[in-house]
């Protein structure tokens, strides 16, 4: 059985980084303490995605980290990923739950209390909540207010991961007390020292 207990630091990959470089960066993040990796690859061919996902899954296995695939359930199944992460425009959660193995982890991006309740009811294991800050990784991201974050926290019985423009320096007490962890792209992958940046995040998240 896969351990679905939440982990605090969650890396989402950046498809704009050449894959060999991304693999090295991901390894550094795992050494630093990242415990979930989500493979996100927009506009890539399925064959290429399967190849890359397989390599990342192998790397995650070496570190005992969970490996999830964004959106593409077919790719997740092909490489025996630990689960998937789906957005509001992707497959319905209950359908994903029917297709994926019984112990698969299913994460869902939500933007308000109603979406959170629906995802939980349909079988989500964790929620990505945001965007908490402006981000270059998603052009159409709408910022979430602290009030909305608190509303989601009040109805959720599963882990919440903050997403969107998160750095070690903008995670204040009000935000942290409503999250179980954070999902990060740029703040880790664009860092000069990914390993140390991961540890910096974990230090803040552990307070």
UniProtKB/Swiss-Prot annotation:
It comes from Clostridium perfringens (strain ATCC 13124 / DSM 756 / JCM 1290 / NCIMB 6125 / NCTC 8237 / Type A). 4-amino-2-methyl-5-(diphosphooxymethyl)pyrimidine binds at residues 38-42, 70, 109, 138. SUPFAM superfamilies: Thiamin phosphate synthase (SSF51391). This is Thiamine-phosphate synthase. The lineage of its organism: Bacteria, Bacillati, Bacillota, Clostridia, Eubacteriales. One of its GO terms (molecular function) is thiamine-phosphate diphosphorylase activity. InterPro entries: Aldolase_TIM, ThiamineP_synth_sf, ThiamineP_synth_TenI, TMP_synthase. Condenses 4-methyl-5-(beta-hydroxyethyl)thiazole monophosphate (THZ-P) and 2-methyl-4-amino-5-hydroxymethyl pyrimidine pyrophosphate (HMP-PP) to form thiamine monophosphate (TMP). 2-[(2R,5Z)-2-carboxy-4-methylthiazol-5(2H)-ylidene]ethyl phosphate binds at residues 135-137, 165, 185-186. PANTHER family: THIAMINE BIOSYNTHETIC BIFUNCTIONAL ENZYME, THIAMINE-PHOSPHATE PYROPHOSPHORYLASE. Keywords: Magnesium, Metal-binding, Thiamine biosynthesis, Transferase. Its EC number is 2.5.1.3. It catalyses: 2-[(2R,5Z)-2-carboxy-4-methylthiazol-5(2H)-ylidene]ethyl phosphate + 4-amino-2-methyl-5-(diphosphooxymethyl)pyrimidine + 2 H(+) = thiamine phosphate + CO2 + diphosphate; 2-(2-carboxy-4-methylthiazol-5-yl)ethyl phosphate + 4-amino-2-methyl-5-(diphosphooxymethyl)pyrimidine + 2 H(+) = thiamine phosphate + CO2 + diphosphate; 4-methyl-5-(2-phosphooxyethyl)-thiazole + 4-amino-2-methyl-5-(diphosphooxymethyl)pyrimidine + H(+) = thiamine phosphate + diphosphate. Its cofactor is Mg(2+). One of its GO terms (cellular component) is cytoplasm. It holds the Pfam family TMP-TENI. The keyword Lipoprotein does not apply. Binds 1 Mg(2+) ion per subunit. The keyword Hydrolase does not apply. GO terms for biological process: thiamine biosynthetic process; thiamine diphosphate biosynthetic process. Pathway: Cofactor biosynthesis; thiamine diphosphate biosynthesis; thiamine phosphate from 4-amino-2-methyl-5-diphosphomethylpyrimidine and 4-methyl-5-(2-phosphoethyl)-thiazole: step 1/1. Belongs to the thiamine-phosphate synthase family. Mg(2+) binds at residues 71, 90. It comes from the Bacteria.
């Amino acid at each position: 059985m896969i351990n679905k207990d939440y982990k605090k630091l969650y890396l989402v990959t950046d498809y704009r980084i050449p894959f060999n470089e991304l693999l090295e960066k991901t390894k550094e993040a795992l050494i630093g303490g990242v415990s979930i990796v989500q493979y996100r690859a927009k506009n890539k061919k399925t064959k290429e995605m399967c190849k890359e996902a397989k390599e990342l899954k192998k790397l995650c296995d070496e570190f005992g980290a969970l490996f999830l695939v964004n959106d593409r359930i077919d790719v997740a199944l092909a490489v025996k990923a630990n689960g998937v992460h789906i957005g509001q425009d992707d497959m319905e959660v209950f359908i994903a739950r029917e297709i994926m193995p019984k112990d698969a982890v299913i994460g869902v991006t939500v933007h308000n209390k109603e979406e959170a309740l629906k995802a939980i009811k349909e079988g989500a294991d964790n929620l990505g909540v945001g965007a908490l800050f402006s981000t270059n990784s998603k052009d159409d991201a709408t910022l979430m207010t602290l009030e909305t974050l608190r509303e989601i926290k009040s109805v959720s019985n599963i882990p919440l991961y903050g997403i969107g423009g998160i750095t070690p320096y903008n995670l204040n007490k009000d935000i942290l007390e409503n999250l179980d962890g954070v999902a990060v792209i740029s703040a880790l992958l664009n860092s000069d020292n990914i390993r140390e940046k991961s540890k910096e995040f974990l230090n803040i998240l552990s307070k």
